[in-house]
């Protein structure tokens, strides 16, 4: 049996790849998990629901605001200090064999505590451009798993530890009750901008079927008036729908792109350009370069442009599904290091 402490949350984009790794590890060996969730965020809710067997501890932290000298960061830094003491207490008691971290501020807290206690650290970065937590933790990690070859350019000092694996995707046996539709989604929090654009697209494309994850009950009601649209406030598990989709329209969060690539669904990406260091734009451009996507910049995203691009991606057709889930590569690497 191995004991694993894990953190990576605040958004679905960090959480789902982490769950994919833990679920794959559990298929290979007996695993006991201590999960550090961000209080009040998606990780708390999803982990308690999907993995009641994990020991889940909620930690009250928020990320540092940019620019880093933002006045509110003084208070946030103090909270990070308190959280670190709490995390250390749990780690000392649980005595994990390793820590798996997938980014976000909670990873930073858990990673630095684990480093002080000499616990082996494994990190995964989902995006092309690494976030602050992964940049800091790479120096202490045993291995740094990355989704894209290009990420090496941002972590030059740690080349020997980097393994390009791709971004883990959660598996599901479930199947959506529909088929041959265009899947529309924001990130794990939905996207007002995409909802507004698509509301203008739907009446123009009555022959095309859409499934739209709206992010709110109000939007679900508003978009349900279109006969060609199945509007859902949140889709769970998303894999059930990716399997049956012919194309997608979304933001350019790393997990959404990972799922497009894993399930072989070509798509339109409208990156959220205010994301830290424009990382969504970099993700989107990489997905386009790899042949999975058409990128529409926010300032050019009109209903007309989307309609033209839907036609192109649908005509392109499905791409071959990935043979091996990156989660499986990562599990093998981790077990190879510690067993
Ligand atoms: C707003 C924000 O900070 N976004 C970041 C966040 O991910 P954010 O959660 O916004 O976006 P991602 O695309 O990475 O992940 C979304 C995840 O939510 C799932 N989903 C979505 C809708 C739904 O109804 N059901 C469902 O399960 C998707 O299948 C996917 O697994 O972390 C990512 C990884 O570091 C970054 O690339 C994103 O830029």
Swiss-Prot record:
GO molecular function: glycosyltransferase activity; UDP-N-acetyl-D-glucosamine:N-acetylmuramoyl-L-alanyl-D-glutamyl-meso-2,6-diaminopimelyl-D-alanyl-D-alanine-diphosphoundecaprenol 4-beta-N-acetylglucosaminlytransferase activity; undecaprenyldiphospho-muramoylpentapeptide beta-N-acetylglucosaminyltransferase activity
UniProt enzyme class: transferase
Topology of this chain in the membrane: Peripheral membrane protein
Record-listed E.C. numbers: 2.4.1.227
Major localization class: membrane
GO cellular component: plasma membrane
Catalytic reaction annotation: di-trans,octa-cis-undecaprenyl diphospho-N-acetyl-alpha-D-muramoyl-L-alanyl-D-glutamyl-meso-2,6-diaminopimeloyl-D-alanyl-D-alanine + UDP-N-acetyl-alpha-D-glucosamine = di-trans,octa-cis-undecaprenyl diphospho-[N-acetyl-alpha-D-glucosaminyl-(1->4)]-N-acetyl-alpha-D-muramoyl-L-alanyl-D-glutamyl-meso-2,6-diaminopimeloyl-D-alanyl-D-alanine + UDP + H(+)
Family to which this protein belongs: Belongs to the glycosyltransferase 28 family. MurG subfamily.
HAMAP family reported in the protein's UniProt record: MurG
Protein name (Swiss-Prot/TrEMBL): UDP-N-acetylglucosamine--N-acetylmuramyl-(pentapeptide) pyrophosphoryl-undecaprenol N-acetylglucosamine transferase
Gene: murG
């Amino acid at each position: 049996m191995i004991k694993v402490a894990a953190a990576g949350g605040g958004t679905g984009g960090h959480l789902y790849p982490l769950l994919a790794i833990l679920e794959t590890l559990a298929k290979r060996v007996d695993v006991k998990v201590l999960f550090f969730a961000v209080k009040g965020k998606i990780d708390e809710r999803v982990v308690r629901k999907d993995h009641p067997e994990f020991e889940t501890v909620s930690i009250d932290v928020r990320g540092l605001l940019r620019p880093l000298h933002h006045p509110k960061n003084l208070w946030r830094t103090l909270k990070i200090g308190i959280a670190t003491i709490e995390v250390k207490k749990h780690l000392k008691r649980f005595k994990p064999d390793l820590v798996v971290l997938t980014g976000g501020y909670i990873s930073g807290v858990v990673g630095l505590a684990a480093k002080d206690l000499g616990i082996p650290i494994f990190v995964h970065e989902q995006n092309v451009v690494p976030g602050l937590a992964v940049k800091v933790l790479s120096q202490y990690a045993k291995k740094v798993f990355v989704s894209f070859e290009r990420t090496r350019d941002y972590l030059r000092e740690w080349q020997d530890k980097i393994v390009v694996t791709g971004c883990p995707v959660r598996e599901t046996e479930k199947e959506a009750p529909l088929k041959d539709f265009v899947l529309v989604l924001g990130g794990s929090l939905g996207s007002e901008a995409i909802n507004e654009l698509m509301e203008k697209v739907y009446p123009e494309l009555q022959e095309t079927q859409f499934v739209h994850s709206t992010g709110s009950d109000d939007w679900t009601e508003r978009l349900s008036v279109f006969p060609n649209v199945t509007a859902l406030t949140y889709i769970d598990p998303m894999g059930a729908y990716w399997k049956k989709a012919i194309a997608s329209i979304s933001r350019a969060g790393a997990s959404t792109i990972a799922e497009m690539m894993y399930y072989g669904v070509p798509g339109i990406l409208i990156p959220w350009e205010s994301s830290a260091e424009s990382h969504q734009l970099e993700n989107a451009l990489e997905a386009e370069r790899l042949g999975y996507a058409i990128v529409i910049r926010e300032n050019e995203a009109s209903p007309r442009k989307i309609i033209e691009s839907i036609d192109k991606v649908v005509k392109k057709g499905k791409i071959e599904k990935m043979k091996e889930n990156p989660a499986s590569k990562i599990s093998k690497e981790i077990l190879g290091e510690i067993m």
